[in-house]
């Protein structure tokens, strides 16, 4: 049933003009169109039903089609169809992909753990790898970067030190002060002979203009847009965005986390004078996986413009194998996206939270969990585990904010603690379990990150960075207001109805 909605809409358009062409009078146009729309909606409902979506998603789409039949059809044609596969990825040379994997597999011994970890951590690394994550890497150092000032300072310093290549990928990249500063640093290195590849998402970075990018092209920087929104494939790609943020310098230094590139991430916007976020600097063996993820995205996005293959990257210049001999703990990089049925990141988060014995602390700007995640958190809280959720007191999305609050009641009743960050916008995406294991990355605790976006997280095992994450959590709790059950249950009926409605349509967000 290829492209069913486009076909149905095409049939509708063609048949709708038949009465005009034939000048028939035995049936009114109003009746004719009404019947045809009914058939179209029934057809779409059938498609939704046989796609075996989650009950919440299925119900949400049925509701939209029932209440907004015309608009609902258009919305579903753009946002609702089942997970789109990267068809161009599948057409790529399987021999090249196999060779690329073999190179990484051949270095598995180099990636094998030599640092002693607890039995639980070792078991988790094995489970996460089965979910699709890369092998856990020791001899890797990580550094927690708190907020924009520290993050951009470290990134610019790393760019300045580049000798061979710089790979940079962002969901949102803005042509403001910090965006221009990073761009100019890239141009300078490109003129010095460093290879620079710049990948940005077509929707998230839709404000980038030719006049901003042209100096980069003139300096020799390779620029690729991930799934442009103005293309023949708009309906195929608009709902599946690349939300990853990656910077790699010489295959030795990497950055990933919650921060995009823009002045607002430095707290320079009137709406959010404080932007609370977290990023991660990585050096060592874990760069193997981070580099591989960037290159896969790069080759996919550039396949329509160039004749790239894996071959130019099969060398030590891109995978130098830098080791940090005195590094503690281990790092595991996990990526997921709509090109695969595996919910690697979601399953990884469930596995990490499921291993908790004492505490589960979560920071997320959007809390719209699926049923499995919500159930795990409820049961953990009931069993006495210290479950805490830190979310923004002031959100950048009213819809997401109301939907998030609809999930608070079952958690508060189970004994979980909810904290509303009051100093600004909480944009960090972090999980901390038992002060021993943590995750940090681009994925929010919501269905979009679990199923629709291309995301990336880093799982940190028993390293000093985990303690730094705990320190930041404790500081954030001091700048937050705890939501008490007695006060929360006194919300007005109007607000509860709004929350419930937003929760009902949350699978569509």
From Swiss-Prot:
Residues at the catalytic site: 243, 245, 250, 427, 429, 434
SUPFAM superfamilies xrefs: Phospholipase D/nuclease
EC nos: 2.7.8.-
TM region(s), chain numbering: 4-24, 30-50, 59-79
Keyword check for Iron: no
A single GO molecular function term of this UniProt record: cardiolipin synthase activity
Topology versus the membrane: Multi-pass membrane protein
InterPro entries reported for this sequence: Cardiolipin_synth_Firmi, Cardiolipin_synthase, CLS_N, PLD-like_dom, PLipase_D/transphosphatidylase
Catalysed transformations (reactions): 2 a 1,2-diacyl-sn-glycero-3-phospho-(1'-sn-glycerol) = a cardiolipin + glycerol
Keyword Cell membrane: yes
Summary of the function given for this chain in its UniProt record: Catalyzes the reversible phosphatidyl group transfer from one phosphatidylglycerol molecule to another to form cardiolipin (CL) (diphosphatidylglycerol) and glycerol.
Homology family: Belongs to the phospholipase D family. Cardiolipin synthase subfamily.
Protein name: Cardiolipin synthase 1
């Amino acid at each position: 049933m290829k492209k069913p909605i486009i076909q149905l809409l095409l049939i509708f358009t063609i048949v709708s003009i038949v009465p005009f062409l034939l000048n028939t009078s035995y049936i009114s146009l109003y009746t004719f169109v009404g019947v045809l729309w009914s058939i179209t909606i029934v057809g779409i409902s059938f498609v939704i039903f046989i796609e075996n979506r989650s009950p919440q998603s299925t119900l949400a789409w049925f509701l939209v089609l029932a209440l907004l039949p015309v608009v609902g059809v258009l919305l579903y044609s753009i946002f609702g169809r089942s997970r789109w596969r990267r068809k161009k990825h599948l057409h790529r040379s399987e021999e090249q992909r196999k060779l690329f994997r073999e190179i990484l597999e051949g270095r598995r011994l180099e990636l094998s753990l030599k640092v002693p970890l607890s039995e639980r951590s070792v078991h988790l690394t094995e489970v996460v790898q089965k979910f699709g994550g890369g092998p856990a890497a020791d001899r890797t150092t990580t550094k927690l970067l708190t907020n924009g000032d520290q993050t951009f300072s470290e990134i610019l310093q790393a760019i300045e030190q580049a000798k061979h290549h710089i790979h940079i990928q962002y969901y949102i990249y803005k042509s403001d002060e910090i965006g221009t500063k990073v761009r100019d640093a890239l141009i300078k290195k490109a003129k010095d002979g460093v290879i620079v590849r710049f990948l940005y998402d077509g929707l998230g970075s839709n404000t980038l203009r030719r006049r901003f990018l042209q100096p980069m092209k003139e300096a020799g920087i390779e620029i690729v847009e991930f799934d442009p929104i103005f293309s023949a494939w708009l309906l195929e790609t608009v709902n599946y965005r690349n939300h990853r943020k990656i910077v790699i310098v010489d295959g030795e230094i990497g950055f990933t986390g919650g921060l995009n590139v823009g002045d607002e991430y430095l707290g320079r916007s009137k709406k959010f004078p404080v932007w609370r976020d977290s990023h991660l600097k990585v050096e060592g063996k874990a760069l193997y996986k981070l580099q591989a993820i960037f290159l896969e995205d790069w080759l996919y996005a550039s396949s329509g413009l160039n004749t790239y293959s894996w071959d130019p990257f099969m060398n030590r210049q891109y995978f130098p194998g830098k080791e940090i001999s005195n590094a503690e703990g281990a790092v595991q990089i996990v990526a997921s996206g709509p090109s695969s049925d595996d919910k690697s990141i979601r399953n990884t988060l469930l596995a990490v939270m499921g291993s908790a014995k004492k505490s589960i602390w979560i920071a997320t700007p959007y809390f719209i969990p699926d049923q499995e995640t919500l159930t795990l958190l409820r049961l953990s809280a009931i069993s006495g585990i210290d479950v805490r959720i830190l979310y923004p007191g002031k959100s950048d999305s009213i819809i997401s904010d109301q939907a998030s609050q609809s999930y608070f009641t079952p958690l508060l009743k189970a004994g979980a603690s909810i904290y509303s960050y009051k100093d600004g916008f909480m944009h960090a995406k972090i999980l901390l379990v038992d002060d021993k294991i943590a995750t940090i990355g681009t994925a929010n605790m919501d269905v979009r990150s679990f199923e629709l976006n291309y995301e990336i997280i880093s799982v940190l095992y028993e390293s000093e960075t985990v303690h730094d994450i705990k320190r930041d959590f404790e500081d954030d709790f001091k700048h937050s207001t705890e939501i008490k059950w007695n006060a929360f249950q006194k919300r007005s009926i109007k607000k509860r109805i709004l929350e419930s409605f937003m929760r009902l349509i949350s699978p569509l967000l």
